[in-house]
Amino acid sequence: MRKKALIFTVIFGIIFLAVLLVSASIYKSAMAQKEEGHEAAAAEAKKETDLAHVDQVETFVGKEKYYVVKGTDKKGTALYVWVPADKKAKILSKEAKEGISEDKAAKIIKDEGLVSKQKEVHLAREGNVLLWEVTYLDKEGQYSLSYVDFTTGKILKNITP
C-alpha cells in the first residue's frame, strides 16, 4: 500500500511540475509579446522628437497599433510621443501640458455618472486624434471604456461590449 502511495505521489509531483513549467513558459512568452517593440519605439521617439529621457512605453491597439512613449525633453518638460507600428503613419508628439491630464480624463468620465469602479487610464490614438482611454466597470458591472479627446477633454466614444 505504501508503495502505491509513493508511486502516486511521484507521478502527481511530476505532472504538477510539468504543468508549472509549461505555465511559466506561456507567461514568459506572453509578457515578451506585450513588450515587443518597446525599445525600438523609444529609440524612434528619441530620434524623431525632442524626447531625451524615456520613463515608460505602453502598447495601444485600436484600429492601428501604436506605442505611447512617456518621458521628458532636455529641459525636463513632460512629453508624450505616439509611435505607430506601421512606419508609414506619422509620429505625433505633445507636451503633457498641451492636453488634459490622466486624472482629468478619469474625472470627466466619472462626472458623466458612468463609472462604478475605475480600472485604468492610458494614452491612445485613433488616426491623428490623440486620446485618453478610460476603462471602468459601469453601473451594471460591465467592463466598459470611453475615449476622451486629449486636447479638448470631450468624450468621443463610450463602448460597453
UniProtKB/Swiss-Prot annotation:
Keywords: Cell membrane, Cell shape, Membrane, Transmembrane, Transmembrane helix
Membrane-crossing residue ranges in chain numbering: 6-26
Stretches of the chain found on the membrane's Cytoplasmic side: 1-5
InterPro entries with a match to the protein in the record: Cystatin_sf, PepSY, regulator_TseB, TseB-like_dom
Biological-process GO terms, alphabetical: regulation of cell shape
Cellular compartments per GO CC: plasma membrane
Main location: membrane
Topology within the bilayer: Single-pass membrane protein
Phenotypic consequence of gene deletion: Cells lacking this gene are deformed, being shorter and wider than wild-type cells. Disruption of the gene can suppress the tetracycline sensitivity of the ezrA mutant.
Annotated compartments: Cell membrane
Residues on Extracellular side: 27-161
Subunit structure, interactors included: Interacts with the penicillin-binding protein PBP2A, a monofunctional transpeptidase.
Entries under NCBIfam families matching the protein: regulator_TseB
Functional note: Required for normal cell shape. Plays an important role in cell wall elongation during exponential phase and spore outgrowth. Probably regulates the activity of the penicillin-binding protein PBP2A through a direct interaction. Not required for PBP2A activity, stability and localization.
Protein name, UniProt field: Probable cell wall elongation regulator TseB
Taxonomic lineage from the root: Bacteria, Bacillati, Bacillota, Bacilli, Bacillales
